[in-house]
Amino acid sequence: PGLNSRYTVDQKKGEKTMAYLKGYVDHIRFRNEDNGYTVLSLDVDGDEETVVGLFPFLNDGEYISLEGDYVDHPVHGPQFQMRTYEIVAPDDIDSMERYLGSGAIKGVGPALAKRITKKFKMDTFRVIEEEPERLAEVKGISEKKARAIAVEFSEKQEMRQAMMFLSGYGINNNLAVKIYKEYGDHLYTIIQENPYKMTDDIAGVGFKIADEIAKKVGIGSSSDYRIISGIFYTLMRALNEGHVFLPKRILCRNAAHILGVTPEDIEEHLLEMMIDRKIVIEEDEETRVYAAPQYHMEVNTARMLLDLNIHYDVSISEVETMIAMIEETEQITFAEKQKEAIHAVAQDSIVVLTGGPGTGKTTTINGMIQYFEHEGLDIRLAAPTGRAAKRMTEATGYEAMTIHRMLEINGEADRERDMKKGNASMFERNAGNPLETDVIIIDEMSMVDLYLMNALLQAMVPGTRLVIVGDANQLPSIGAGNVLKDMIASGQFKVVELNQIFRQELLHVYEQKSKSRDEGSHIVRNAHLIHQGRPVELDNKSRDFFFLQRNNIQDVLGVLVYLVRDKLPGYVHVKPYDIQILTPMRKGELGVERLNQVMQQYLNPPSDEKKEKEIAFGLFREGDKVMQIKNNYQIEWEMRNSKGFTVDKGVGVFNGDMGIITEINDYTEKITVLFDETREVQYPYASLDELELAYAVTIHKSQGSEYPAVVMPILSGPRVLFHRNLLYTGVTRAKNCLTIVGDRNMLFSMIQNVNEQRRYTTLALRLDQIANESEESGPMDDLGI
């Protein structure tokens, strides 16, 4: 049927009433730039209609025809839900004037639009496109402004055409804008000939997106472009699994599997990629293949570490006197290893302090701080996560912050781009703008990956002291590298390992029990037994370490619910949300995904007062405990005081940060999350894949955190996951109470299993190589003599 401004067609009984509208876009109320979901006001013969739907390319002032349904939204009232729409080219003077005056063309407002259309009438658009110099005939338009209007008008048309073209390949609005800005009109050629080029040039375009486009335009599976891009993608995927390089045989096998070609096809392209400096190949006992940015990042990290590593000649007796003074002031007695650590920071500019739980790392850090303060040195404390930084502040009494915040992460941060390029442009603090301090102390160093270490070192000047603290027996960082272990293994730095257990005091949160029970911390004791490969004590006679034998999944689930909801909150004097379930796996009946569904049902059941949002893998509900599962360096956060006023703000929420959903707003399509009871963050619905429920998390994700009470289900699972390091890391996350539920034999099997997956890194090798080069070349060699 022909379109009038508004009419409806009655459907069969029980179906929605289809309606047709035609009118001007008065203004855009809301738009989600990731998926194009838009709420707009449409002027239909002078009446305003609220229209919702996917309009990624629509601007104020445009004339559109729509087909859709009238619906009554429970919160926002009547609105028109678009099914299909069409942009109608302005075909009368009023339409042209309205479009030009809508703000769609920069520098043209309603008054100027009226003068332009009055002058050129129905020829207005033709003049702008074909004779733009004639715009200068209109009062208020210079020749320069005429050219600017024409360029803006043309770019608007070209961008819309490009974005609609790209949307046909499944590319969202935000990404389409990036592609258009990067390539302009050349994007059509690139899409048709080599869409894989976008993976090199544009953050957010990965191999899978490019590969889907390539299939649609008919590029074959054995294309050189495809294989080269696929090899780099395989190396980047390995990077996300923690590897800095891959052995050639594994790279060829993995890439061949991903691409559906043979390993020989992969190997044929490696030399070409090396010549183009995309990869670096090193021949040794095994042939190593690196993505070039990661190779140079590892080499530069090693060089910067060695450049910072300076030995000072100090009076040992003076340090001894200082230690004695600290002991007297603080009413403590340092163990010999703790004294050794304070001597170390007096003599060496890089010191590694390592040790398990309860070995006195915090006491030692405090002693170091007192020594540095006596020397008049400025000190900065930092940790990889907000939780770890908060614990560091509480333990030392000195302000600690995340490493990202110390390095002043900027709003343009893009880690994916930086990893591809091998730089750290996301931080304001760098070689050109270094940190102004004398000493940096980093805690939870096992979580620091190669990228973050490289960025930190770039922001340090020679003469700055670096103390790194961590437990080398925990799992390595989620990101690439194994920095702490590699630094220790290299033998190039002063390492002090604390091995005497001090934390045996009675934990104050527990009520007094039978005097016959051991008053020591069995969490600490058993953690050290696990590290040594010895059986743990499972007699349940302690106040903080419990084991409950259960033989099937349903029994384990029942006990988990009982412990978290009913038993432990009163025993440890915390809220159920402060009790953390840690599991080795993501999948399976006792994996993260299933456990979160179960615990959500019992800890935060449905309620008329709680709004919900369905997502691809379940739903979020107001009051849910959630975790950020990928780094987002651009997202903004605010801290508010009790009166609701903003007292601080910044950018960045990081992998592993936990919070509570405080609001779900269907109108703005945003979810509000409160992290660490301080930082408020709003997530567009399109970004909800960055969050997941966190009643249960993997042990790996828990690293760097500490919880009042931890519950761990250990029943059965693959040997590659159920190993000693994983168990040790999980046990050491518990501060006041740990309960393991499951099979005793599997627990003992984990203690004996030391076969954790190898991480392919060569930082230790680089440190040895560069240090040996420096020793072999004397001062004359350095001068080229």
Describe the role of every protein-language-model region.
Residues 17-32, 68, 658-662:
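Structural detector for short beta-strands of small beta-barrel domains
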Residues 30-42, 667-673:
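Short aromatic-glycine-enriched beta-strand elements
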